[in-house]
UniProtKB/Swiss-Prot annotation:
Protein name: Recombination protein RecR
One GO term (biological process): DNA repair
UniProt keywords, alphabetically: DNA damage, DNA recombination, DNA repair, Metal-binding, Zinc, Zinc-finger
Organism: Burkholderia vietnamiensis (strain G4 / LMG 22486)
Source organism phylogeny: Bacteria, Pseudomonadati, Pseudomonadota, Betaproteobacteria, Burkholderiales
Domain Toprim: 80-175
Length: 198
């Protein structure tokens, strides 16, 4: 039996989510249609609202509803410190530690040549312009401790050091292969406080 095209379309859309394969997508779709139509409608409205209202901050590239995000607009932040993270989720984890009071730049990814992700795709030129504004004195590389995250940190570190900037890297404590989004706030706080020069 062939499933209805509307259901097939929903399953395909759910497969676009990270970590959701064909079977999981099908289970989610059936659950929403069979047991939680109200939740499905709420999910649809929330997705539509987010796509219509969220944009990238003109300064740091994170998600925001305004041209400039709340962090970049905060005069209490230290503009001489610029922390580079892979995702907005990583930025939120660092913020929850309450140990970092500088500004951010969100790459929205990491270098991965095998996947076709190079410097352009991680907004490298924007980062260099931001870091070279004459105000930033130290760039903290807080990319994940995965192979791609380490390669990204190395590439960024070499390039930014060549421009005369002090470049530091989060200290270990964040497990090798670990992603900041899944690390507890205490470990991230310790890694931020013990960051090292590159």
């Amino acid at each position: 039996m062939k499933q209805p095209s509307a259901l097939s379309s929903l399953v395909e859309a759910l497969r676009a989510l990270p970590g959701v394969g064909p079977k999981s997508a099908q289970r989610i779709a059936y659950h929403l249609m069979q047991h939680d139509r109200e939740g499905a409608e709420r999910l649809g409205r929330s997705l539509l609202f987010a796509t219509e209202h969220l944009q990238h901050c003109e300064k740091c590239n994170t998600f925001t509803e305004a041209q400039i995000c709340e962090v970049c607009s905060d005069d209490e932040r230290d503009p001489t410190l610029l922390c580079v993270v892979e995702t907005p989720a990583d930025q939120i984890m660092l913020e929850q530690t309450m140990t970092y009071r500088g500004l951010y730049f969100v790459l929205m990814g990491r270098l991965s040549p095998l996947d076709g992700i190079g410097p352009k795709e991680i907004h490298f030129d924007r980062l260099v312009r931001r870091a070279s504004d004459g105000v930033v004195k130290e760039v903290v590389l807080a990319t994940n401790f995965t192979n791609e995250g380490e390669a990204t940190a190395h590439y960024l570190g070499q390039t930014l050091k060549a421009r005369g900037l002090a470049v530091t890297r989060l200290a270990r404590g964040v497990p090798v292969g670990g992603e900041l989004e899944y690390v507890d706030a205490g470990t991230i706080a310790r890694a931020m406080l013990d960051r090292r020069t590159m």
